[in-house]
A protein has these predicted regions:
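Anionic-ligand binding patches
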Residues: 2-8, 14-202
């Protein structure tokens, strides 16, 4: 494994790491979580998923001296004017308290009928080869669905138990991982990124 094939993932989220490793490691890229290198996360000051992904990737690359890949993703609910949006992970206040976020989302939608519960996941990815990379690889993908009335399924993470996938009679948390990795916002974004990697960087 050559050094440039090791990529620092600018995240401490093990759920995300599993999805990235499943797709990138067969291509020869070793994924190392930033927390394994004692790198903390910078303050997310961007106004969009893409801005935050670029910010996090540059910071991880600066701290590690290595290639860095950042994901900024979240859920946008139409009835809530796009909330929780870029604040998805800290919607309930404490960053990463998934259960509290799901409870708050259900409460916010308690009077919203089924036909008006449309939502979509977004995933922005940014890969930089060094902290000042003038041409970072970026992609933005989405995944359509709606918000259910209660949690279903034990797979996935985040809002997956509430996110009913358009065209499938199940939540994202009920999908087998190999299916989710193909059709989700992150799966699609990773597919687009790997295409760019194969054609631009190999």
């Amino acid at each position: 494994m050559t050094m440039e094939k090791t990529i620092v993932l600018a995240s401490g989220n093990e759920g995300k790491a599993r999805e990235f490793r499943a797709i990138l490691e067969p291509m020869g890229y070793k994924i190392v979580l930033q927390k394994e290198l004692n790198i903390s996360s910078p303050e997310e000051t961007g106004k969009s998923f893409l801005e935050n992904a670029i910010l996090k990737a540059r910071y991880a690359s600066e701290q590690s001296g290595m290639w860095a890949l950042a994901d900024d993703s979240g859920l946008a609910v139409d009835a809530l004017n796009g909330a929780p949006g870029i604040y998805s992970a800290r919607y309930a206040g404490e960053h990463g308290d998934e259960k509290a976020c799901n409870i708050k989302l259900l409460d916010a939608l308690k009077n919203v009928p089924d036909g008006k519960r449309a939502a979509r996941y977004y995933c922005a990815l940014c890969l930089v080869r060094h902290k000042d990379d003038p041409v970072p690889l970026t992609v933005l993908s989405s995944w359509e669905g709606s918000i259910g009335h209660n949690e279903k399924g034990s797979g996935g993470f985040g809002y997956d138990p509430l996110f009913i996938v358009t065209g499938r009679d199940c939540t994202a948390a009920e999908l087998p991982p190999q299916i989710k990795n193909l059709i989700s916002h992150r799966g699609r974004a990773l597919a687009a990124l790997t295409y760019k990697l194969e054609h631009n960087l190999s």
